From Swiss-Prot:
Keywords: DNA-binding, Nucleus, Transcription, Transcription regulation. It comes from Drosophila melanogaster (Fruit fly). Residues 569-614, 621-632 bind DNA. Residues 1-97, 221-249, 281-348, 362-434, 447-497, 772-900, 925-977 are annotated as: Disordered. Probably acts as a transcriptional regulator. Required for the specification of the tarsal segment. Also involved in antenna development. 'Bric-a-brac' means 'jumble' in French (referring to the mutant ovary phenotype). This is Protein bric-a-brac 1. PROSITE patterns: BTB (PS50097), HTH_PSQ (PS50960). The keyword Transcription regulation applies.
Amino acid sequence: MASAQAETNVGLASEQGPVAQRQRKGTGSGADSPKSNRSSPTQQEEKRIKSEDRTSPTGGAKDEDKESQGHAVAGGGGSSPVSSPQGRSSSVASPSSSSQQFCLRWNNYQTNLTTIFDQLLQNECFVDVTLACDGRSMKAHKMVLSACSPYFQTLLAETPCQHPIVIMRDVNWSDLKAIVEFMYRGEINVSQDQIGPLLRIAEMLKVRGLADVTHMEAATAAAAAASSERMPSSPKESTSTSRTEHDREREAEELLAFMQPEKKLRTSDWDPAELRLSPLERQQGRNVRKRRWPSADTIFNPPAPPSPLSSLIAAERMELEQKERERQRDCSLMTPPPKPPMSSGSTVGATRRLETAIHALDMPSPAATPGPLSRSSRPHSQSPQQQQAQQQGQLPLPLPLHPHHHASPAPHPSQTAGSAHHPASPAGDSRFPLGPAAAMAAARELSGLGPGPSAEPRLPPPPPHHHGGGGVGGGGVGGGGAGGVGSGGGSSLADDLEIKPGIAEMIREEERAKMMENSHAWMGATGSTLAADSYQYQLQSMWQKCWNTNQNLMHHMRFRERGPLKSWRPETMAEAIFSVLKEGLSLSQAARKYDIPYPTFVLYANRVHNMLGPSIDGGPDLRPKGRGRPQRILLGIWPDEHIKGVIKTVVFRDTKDIKDESLAAHMPPYGRHSPAFPLQDLPLSYPGASGALAGAPSSMACPNGSGPQTGVGVAGEQHMSQETAAAVAAVAHNIRQQMQMAAVPPGLFNLPPHPGVGGGVGNVPGAAGGRASISPALSSGSGPRHAPSPCGPAGLLPNLPPSMAVALHHQQQQQAAHHHMQQLHLQQQQAHLHHHQQQQQQQQQQHHQGGHQVAHKSGFGASSSSSASSSSMGQHHAPKAKSSPLRSETPRLHSPLGDLGLDMASYKREFSPSRLFAEDLAELVGASVSSSSSSAAAATAPPERSAGAASAATGADAPSSSSSGGIKVEPITTTSE
């Protein structure tokens, strides 16, 4: 700066501009020239102009004076700074100006300069310093920063770096930006709530115009003197200052004797970019031994998620670590010699001495840091020695292990004595609350998780800072002492625990990088690897494990055996198919509208179309759609009830029947789901099962199509032993699954596969009739899948879903005797009549019961199912007697269903939730809930309806099943075996 001395007047005190230039052209320093031409008119005029200017926007006369003074000194001025206007004008008068001189004035010079500087800032032209905070950075000009802040002036003067990066801690990005704008423009607009923090930071950075910088001026003067001593601009200057410097040097040497080994270090050893300088940082830096200072920041401010700057800094830091390690060996750690407590008067002197000493070492001066300076000077700032002793008294000795720097020890009484004294540690400083990062560091240190093994142990506990009047009284000296030395206890420990810094640093970086990769950066914010690994990492992995487990469970519990998860709800699918049939949307339109994958939608629509059977308008084409002709579904006309029944069967079978029937029990809406389903009560008695209960094989066969056997078995074993029942249930469950897999003949689309098919059609005709005819809903549920060919019981039975089979068997068991007889006859008849009758019944049911009948629709299944549902209901209500025994037993049976919580038996007619589903469906499909209710009614009024079914069902409960749908259950259907 000394070299720029002449310019200081020009650049900084605008009114001196032209004059200063003239002065430069003249002999040089006007103050020394005897001939200064004070009376010349021009000079008078200049004087006048100057005094006017002194009130210029930059801040009033007082500020101007301060500025010129500070800068003149900073320049190392041969010309003593004169603060009186006359002095100033005289200094500009050129001694040799015998000829008249003219003042050339640039009126809007100041505004122009301001504008230009602002433009340079915006365009980042000629920038030579980077300010960073909060992970963001902005480039600025050293000259402007120095002009506006003695803090920056000192800082940048000490940093012999082309383009230093100043990392501000505990500074908000918005505040920093505003302050820099203020320095460049002289004014900013801020909201009210921003003013407080802004002024706090301005105070910290000693920004002229926003903060009182008088305290800094003295320090700056000392700094300037020291720097001018290093690079004297003229021999005369150096001699003038040398004596005082010499004295200062001697005092400083006493102060810094304990740093002796390091005294050899010169700034060249420090890479200035490495000095991460921020006011608070430097304050805290004093706590750390000097050689450790550069990376002290890593300790106090645990690495935040890496910013572009931090990687550079880390690399440089690693090189430094090597040098530091060697240095460390030389630096014997000893506490500074105790000094008698200084009175506040001597504080400033001490400050200066310390400062110059530090300058002599080319070390960044802690004193220059604008620590919060308490205005009231301390009555007695204690010497570093005392402070450290005090601190060690306060902090238990284990502390050096993980220094809780920021946990401020209970302030020592002496500290609290002085008014406005800041508590022992910077963290405690009320005016400078820790930023989030520092707070985190404090917390981490408290919890013993240091940012890394190497950095921590090396920090001796910081001596409490006492900020005395001069700004450095006890604070500076104490800080210096602590910085260089560390407390005795801490030092030995620190050295014992030391890990080679370079290595530790590398390890830390590596861990951090690994963490960033592994944790997708969401744990990256915790600088502490330990913390992340131990807590967040575990949390995350636990969460993932749970997620995976749940996914697997979901897969297993899906109702579909294979294929990806569905992205659509069955209700949506039902609506979409219905809209194709009724609104004439094309398949692709409907798929888009309802957001169902097109191929899936075509699959379901085709299935529905196939099951709808011939269209009312007599369209001739019954063949399944040819490849690439899915749209044919649009051509037919079918009764709404019929359509809804088929849709329920096709669409809801997937979702609602666990492996078909197993879930079916839960679904009231379909026949088998309808609450009326006694079948469900008999859950495990398979049609085959009931018959099979006695003769499992034969009964199983029955469900598959040997009606007579089933019937017989059923009759015989209505009350099987639980063990048998369980065994049968298991077998039945397997068979059920197989049956589910069976192809569904298109003709059977209407069959409620379970009810009609298994029970009604062939196997358990009687039983099925009563119960086997699962409620139409049931049949509809499984119908599509199971619907066997309309032709025969055999076909039907194989398709029976397991639940259907169960239902059939239970019914069979109850009605077994009658059913056997009927089943035999009926089976034969069924083959021929069943299909037609059921279809008729289905249609009737559709009309009568809407949804319910739809369920029944399935050809043979229909009548049987309706009768079954009624009978089952009857059983539940009245006949419950029979069904309930089974039912009560069933839960005990160990069937796969039971494990799934799907025990069929458990669903009793009374179970109203079953009706809920019916209602939902009805809403969806537009069918009235009556269908389900009708089946319930049938069950309730089994005796009346049973007329047809009674004979068919011949079971006690069978009668009720006769017309659950309002359809007469024909004995054939009931017996349908």
